[in-house]
Amino acid sequence: MQRIIGTEVEYGISSPSDPTANPILTSTQAVLAYAAAAGIQRAKRTRWDYEVESPLRDARGFDLSRSAGPPPVVDADEVGAANMILTNGARLYVDHAHPEYSAPECTDPLDAVIWDKAGERVMEAAARHVASVPGAAKLQLYKNNVDGKGASYGSHENYLMSRQTPFSAIITGLTPFLVSRQVVTGSGRVGIGPSGDEPGFQLSQRSDYIEVEVGLETTLKRGIINTRDEPHADADRYRRLHVIIGDANLAETSTYLKLGTTALVLDLIEEGPAHAIDLTDLALARPVHAVHAISRDPSLRATVALADGRELTGLALQRIYLDRVAKLVDSRDPDPRAADIVETWAHVLDQLERDPMDCAELLDWPAKLRLLDGFRQRENLSWSAPRLHLVDLQYSDVRLDKGLYNRLVARGSMKRLVTEHQVLSAVENPPTDTRAYFRGECLRRFGADIAAASWDSVIFDLGGDSLVRIPTLEPLRGSKAHVGALLDSVDSAVELVEQLTAEPR
C-alpha cells in the first residue's frame, strides 16, 4: 500500500474555571503556548502559506461563490489565526473555535495511526503549557466531535487519488461503504439527535450531522461525500478525497481500520473495473437515512434499503466490501499491510456479529458502551441521566491520567497497535517516506530561515529582496531516500536552496 493518507482533528476545548471563556481565545492560547514551549519565538514562528488554498473549489467542476467581496486576507497575528508547522511535518493551528492538529502525510495506515496519536500528545502538552502561564485559565482538551449543545466539529481524513478516476465512480462506490463503516469506526455517543436530547446511545458522534448525500461544505449541509477539490499536489495528476463523515477515534484499531479499509476500497474503485469487480449493486435507496438508522442501533440488527429493494444491515454491507477487497488484494502481488488490514477487518466483523462487546478491547464504541453500561447498572441510571454525558466526555479527555480511554489503556483493557515510544518519536519527527520529511526537517534544521510553509511548498527568507518558494507538489518526493543525503550535506538554508535551485548540468 502506498496511497498518501492523513488525518486532521479539531479538538474540543473547555475552561472549567471560566465557563464564559472565549474558545477562540483559549484555542489560540493553546497553540501559542505549545509554540513557546518548543522555543519558537513569535517573530520567528513559521507562517502558513495560504496562497495555494482553494477551499471553495468543487470536485464536480465549479467554484462555490463567496457571499460577497474578495477572498479574505488572513492576518497571522490575529487572535484565532495562531498557526505553526511542527518538526514532525504536522500543522497545529486554530480552526474556527478549536485547536486543530493536521497530521503529516503517510503512506502506511499504521504510520497514520502513530502520527494521529502523536496529535493527542501534542494537545495534552499544549494544555499543560497553558496551565503553567501565570494567570491563564486551565484548559481541558477532548478528542471528540460534539459539544453537547448541538454543534459538531470535524475529524477529517484525506486520501490522494488519481485525477483519472471519475468523481461519479467515487460517489457510487464509496457511499455505501462510508454509510456502513461506522459499525467499526464509530466512537460512540450518548444522546440521539444533533443536541443529544433524545435518550439513548448510538455508534457515531458524527452521523446526526450528515444532511445530504454529496456536498462541498463541512460546517453545514454536511455530505456523506465531500466534494472539496483542493489536492495540495499536482492538480493535473491528483485529487485529494476529503472525508468528513468520520468520528475522532482514540482506539488504535478503530483508526487503523478506518484509514486502512477506506484506502483499500479506494483501490477497489480505481482498479476494480480491470478485475471485473463492480460496486453499483450496493447503491442505497436513502443514504442519509441509512447513516442515521445504522448509527442508532447498537445491536447492529437495523437494516437499510438498497436501491434494488434488498434490505441489509451495516455489518452485511461491510462484509460485502470486505469480500470484494479481499478478492482484489489476492489478485495483486503480496502486500503484508493490505493482507493485515483484510485479516483484522474480517476478525472484527466476526466478533461484532457474535457479540459487539467482544470488541470492547479493540474499538471505541463498544469500549465506551461497556463503560456506560457498567456505570448505569452500578448507579441504577436510565439513558436520560445527565451523568452519562459526562462519562462520554471523559472518555475523550486527552490527559493520560484522567481520560477514561487512556485509563483503559493503562490497565491493559484496550489493545494497542503501536508503542508509546513510537508515538513520542512521532511528536518530534516526520514520516520518512513522504514530502513531510522535507518539510519537517527543514523546520528542525533551518526554522529561523523559513517564512512560511504549506502542504505543497516551503518558503525561505534568506535575507534577500524576495522570498524563495520551494514547491513540493509531488507527495512522494521529499522523502528521506530522496533528500536525506542532501539535507545532511548542507550547513545552512542558503546552501540548501542553492542546491535545490541550481541549474542541472
Swiss-Prot record:
Residues annotated for ATP binding in this entry: G6, T7, E8, V9, E10, S102, A103, N158, R240
Any GO BP annotation: proteasomal protein catabolic process
Mutagenesis / variant outcome for changing E100A: Abolishes pupylation
Superkingdom of this protein's organism: Bacteria
Annotated binding of Mg(2+) 2, by residue: E8, H156, H242
Entry EC no(s): 3.4.-.-, 3.5.1.119
Recorded consequence of changing E10A: Abolishes pupylation and depupylase activity
Stretches of the chain forming a coiled coil according to its record: none
Keyword Cytoplasm: no
Residues that coordinate or bind Mg(2+) 1: E8, Y93, E100
Cofactor stoichiometry and binding remark: ATP is required for the deamidation and depupylation reactions but is not hydrolyzed during the reactions.
Enzyme class: hydrolase
Pathway: Protein degradation; proteasomal Pup-dependent pathway
Cofactor: ATP
Reaction(s) catalysed by this chain's protein: [prokaryotic ubiquitin-like protein]-C-terminal-L-glutamine + H2O = [prokaryotic ubiquitin-like protein]-C-terminal-L-glutamate + NH4(+)
Keyword entries, A-Z: ATP-binding, Hydrolase, Magnesium, Metal-binding, Nucleotide-binding, Virulence
Disrupted-gene phenotype: Disruption of dop abolishes pupylation. Cells lacking this gene also become hypersensitive to reactive nitrogen intermediates (RNI) and are severely attenuated for survival and growth in mice. They also cannot depupylate proteasome substrates.
Similarity remark: Belongs to the Pup ligase/Pup deamidase family. Pup deamidase subfamily.
Subunit structure: Interacts with the prokaryotic ubiquitin-like protein Pup.
Function description: Specifically catalyzes the deamidation of the C-terminal glutamine of the prokaryotic ubiquitin-like protein Pup to glutamate, thereby rendering Pup competent for conjugation. Also displays depupylase (DPUP) activity, removing conjugated Pup from target proteins; is thus involved in the recycling of Pup and may function similarly to deubiquitinases (DUBs) in eukaryotes to prevent or promote proteasomal degradation of certain proteins.
NCBIfam families cross-referenced by the UniProt entry: depupylase_Dop
Protein name in UniProt: Pup deamidase/depupylase
Organism of derivation: Mycobacterium tuberculosis (strain ATCC 25618 / H37Rv)
